[in-house]
């Protein structure tokens, strides 16, 4: 077992010509630290100092599953985001909020979880949160949207878990809605390989199958490409402000704004189409994903989301 407080170990990893420096000079642009809450502050201090001494733009992101501003481990409150350690963290709280909303449609709980992180995190950390909805530690997103906690089932159940055609189509609709949130909440979207191609699976090791070269779900792939283009066209999604607008009746809405550019994101988790009546600044404006007609309201299909730009 490694003692991360050991001076020689810290020197080996973070010292001059150490492991951190080696891979940065080889072309890496930063690090994601696995299970950062199991690393002591002394190690994190020296590691992050070493990385930043080479280039202040190099990024260090830690794997923290809870709110990183009040995480308790190693016998005390951690100082990840106080300015001398991590730049940001993997955003498991947002992932949990998105998945739970997609499964159960409780809008109020979703917004409460998101607002809590937005209020607690420094703006610099908030803007570079690693927003994922699937990782090597979780069940595949398509499977997880239909089967809650599948990764905790016996392996003989997980190995045979494959969505029916009806379940798959429902999961795809929920995935598309979920990814709109993933791509528009504060932070940057991170995609676990294969999610953009329709890969299914339970927990480890069933979430680590080969990429389906030649058998990708082109509809899902094209959806991710479309969202990527929308995101890249909007500066307000890089580091704009976030404001909740509404959260009720299985529907959520929020705005992002920066330097005069403003969008409203509306997600409908209901099993039916809704008419969402808009504030004045978004009436008769442009819907960016589908080109949906916008008057003083917008029609949003079941399990779907829209992005409306005010100007």
Positions of the model-derived regions?
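Aromatic- and acidic-residue-enriched carbohydrate-binding clefts of CAZyme catalytic domains
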Residues: 1-4, 21, 154, 158
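Short, acidic/polar
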Residues: 5-24, 175-179
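Active-site-proximal helices and loops of the catalytic beta/alpha 8
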Residues: 18-21, 29-129, 181, 198-226, ...
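Short, solvent-exposed loop/turn segments at secondary-structure junctions
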Residues: 24, 29, 37-40, 65-68, ...
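Short beta-strand segments
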Residues: 31-34, 61-63, 131-134, 192-193, ...
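Aromatic/acidic polysaccharide-binding cleft in carbohydrate-active enzymes
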Residues: 75, 131-163, 179-217
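Carbohydrate-interacting/catalytic domains
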Residues: 76, 171-172, 184-191, 197-311
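Aromatic-anchored helix/helix-loop segment that forms the rim or "lid"
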Residues: 108-111, 115-117, 149-176, 233
């Amino acid at each position: 077992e490694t003692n991360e407080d050991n001076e020689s170990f810290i020197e080996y990893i973070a010292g001059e010509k150490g492991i951190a420096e080696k891979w940065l000079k080889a072309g890496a642009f930063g690090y994601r630290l696995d299970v950062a809450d199991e690393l002591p502050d002394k190690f994190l201090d020296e590691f992050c100092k070493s990385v930043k001494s080479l280039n202040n733009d190099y990024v260090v992101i830690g794997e923290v599953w809870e709110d990183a501003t009040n995480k308790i481990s190693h016998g005390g409150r951690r100082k990840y985001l106080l300015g001398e350690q991590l730049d940001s963290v993997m955003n498991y709280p947002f992932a949990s909020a998105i998945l739970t909303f997609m499964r159960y449609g409780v809008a109020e709980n979703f917004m409460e979880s998101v607002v809590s992180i937005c209020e607690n995190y420094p703006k610099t950390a908030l803007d570079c949160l690693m927003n994922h909805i699937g990782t090597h530690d979780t069940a595949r997103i398509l499977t997880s949207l239909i089967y809650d906690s599948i990764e905790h089932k016996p392996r003989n159940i997980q190995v045979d878990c494959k969505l029916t055609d009806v379940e798959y189509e429902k999961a795809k609709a929920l995935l598309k809605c979920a990814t709109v949130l993933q791509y528009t909440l504060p932070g940057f979207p991170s995609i676990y390989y294969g999610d953009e191609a329709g890969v299914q699976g339970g927990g480890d090791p069933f979430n680590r199958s080969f990429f389906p070269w030649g058998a990708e779900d082109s509809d899902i792939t094209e959806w991710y490409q479309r969202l990527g283009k929308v995101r890249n066209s909007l500066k307000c999604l890089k580091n704009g402000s976030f404001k909740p607008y509404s959260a009720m009746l299985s529907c959520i809405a929020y705005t992002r704004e920066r330097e005069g550019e403003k969008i409203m994101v509306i997600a409908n988790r209901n099993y039916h189409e809704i008419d969402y009546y808009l504030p004045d600044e978004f009436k008769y404006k442009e819907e960016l994903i589908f080109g949906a007609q916008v008057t003083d309201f917008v029609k949003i299909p079941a399990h779907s989301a829209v992005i409306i730009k005010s100007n």
